[in-house]
């Protein structure tokens, strides 16, 4: 019977300890300056530049000569940096 209690204690303790590591999913926005932005060029530049981030999407404004890149990024800390905004714990 003592072994059962010891086993339950170890399982509960490991669950509490592992729940201390929180992961956050954050939305981010960043821009890249280009000479003559097009939809295809912006898609290529966004995917090349931000390979470490997930769900990279893109848009462009030809008047500003910039490609806008946005998507989601998984972080261990929810601190805003690198254009990161709106973090939610996952």
From Swiss-Prot:
Main location: secreted
Keyword Signal: yes
Keywords attached to this entry: Disulfide bond, Secreted, Signal, Toxin
Domain of life: Eukaryota
Protein name, UniProt field: U-scoloptoxin(15)-Sa3a
Organism: Scolopendra alternans
Post-translational modification: Contains 3 disulfide bonds.
Record localization: Secreted
GO molecular function: toxin activity
Intrachain S-S bonds: none
Tissue-by-tissue expression: Expressed by the venom gland.
GO cellular component, one term: extracellular region
Signal peptide extent: 1-18
KW Cytoplasm (keyword) present: no
């Amino acid at each position: 019977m003592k072994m059962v209690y010891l086993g339950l204690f170890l399982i509960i303790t490991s669950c509490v300890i592992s729940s201390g590591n929180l992961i956050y999913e954050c939305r981010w926005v960043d821009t890249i300056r280009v000479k003559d932005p097009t939809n295809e060029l912006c898609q290529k530049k966004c995917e090349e530049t931000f390979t470490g981030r997930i769900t990279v999407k893109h848009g462009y404004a030809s008047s500003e000569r910039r490609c806008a890149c946005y998507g989601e990024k998984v972080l261990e800390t929810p601190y805003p940096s690198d254009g990161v905004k709106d973090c939610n714990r996952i």
